[in-house]
């Protein structure tokens, strides 16, 4: 049996995909989840907090398992695969199409919980790759921040460059950018 919080998040995902963030209400989510609005508010103080938790859940769910720290190619491949999975998320497509100002807030004004979690995960993986001698020296947190920016930009801006980058080209160029940023040996 699904617990109430999971049912609410699942219902919120369906409502956002169907109607967008701005048109999704607590009543709609509660109705779809089969719970009272009070149950929703026991878990989250407001719909905005609930929707932030939803986005975090969906993004964290695509984080990949660890790769051997001595294999930069495996790390780059898994970063590109993860970026592609995020790029293809129906939730992200819906937000980009119906609520671009919300996305802009997390690109131009502040980082969200999921971005902080992804950064921390990247920093740990980069530190392990540095210890194995395959990632260049430097502050792992700073390298992770730039890696996050590169991948985030590639994911969010991909629809703008389809004229020049097909799917294979997008993957190839993102991999080259990430490898060039992280590589300790200067391979390009």
Which residue ranges define each predicted feature?
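Helix-turn-helix
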Residues: 7, 11, 15-49, 53
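Short amphipathic alpha-helical elements of helix-turn-helix/winged-helix folds
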Residues: 11-15, 85, 150
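Hydrophobic alpha-helical connector segments
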Residues: 53, 64-92, 144-147, 171
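Amphipathic alpha-helical packing segments from all-alpha helical-bundle domains
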Residues: 63, 104-132, 141-145
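Amphipathic alpha-helical segments used for helix-helix packing
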Residues: 87-109
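Hydrophobic/aromatic-rich alpha-helical bundle segments in the mid-to-C-terminal region
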Residues: 94-95, 101, 131-177, 188
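Tryptophan-centric aromatic hotspots in well-structured domains and transmembrane helices
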Residues: 43-44, 106, 178
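Generic hydrophobic, amphipathic alpha-helix propensity
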Residues: 1-12, 29, 54-58, 62, ...
């Amino acid at each position: 049996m699904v617990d109430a919080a999971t049912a609410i998040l699942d219902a919120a995902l369906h409502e956002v995909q169907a109607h967008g963030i701005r048109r999704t209400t607590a009543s709609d989510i509660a109705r779809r989840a089969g719970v009272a609005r009070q149950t929703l508010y026991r878990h989250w103080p407001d719909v905005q907090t609930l929707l932030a938790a939803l986005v975090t859940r969906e993004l964290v769910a695509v984080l990949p398992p660890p790769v051997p720290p001595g294999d930069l190619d495996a790390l780059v491949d898994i970063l590109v695969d993860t970026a592609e999975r995020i790029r293809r998320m129906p939730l992200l497509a819906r937000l980009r199409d119906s609520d671009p100002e919300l996305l802009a807030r997390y690109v131009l004004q502040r980082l969200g919980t999921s971005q902080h979690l992804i950064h921390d995960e990247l920093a740990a993986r980069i530190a392990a790759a540095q210890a194995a001698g395959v990632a260049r020296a430097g502050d792992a947190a700073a390298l992770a921040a730039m890696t996050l920016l590169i991948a985030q930009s590639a994911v969010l801006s991909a629809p703008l460059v389809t004229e020049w980058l097909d799917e294979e080209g997008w993957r190839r160029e993102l991999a080259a950018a990430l490898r060039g940023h992280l590589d300790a040996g200067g391979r390009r």
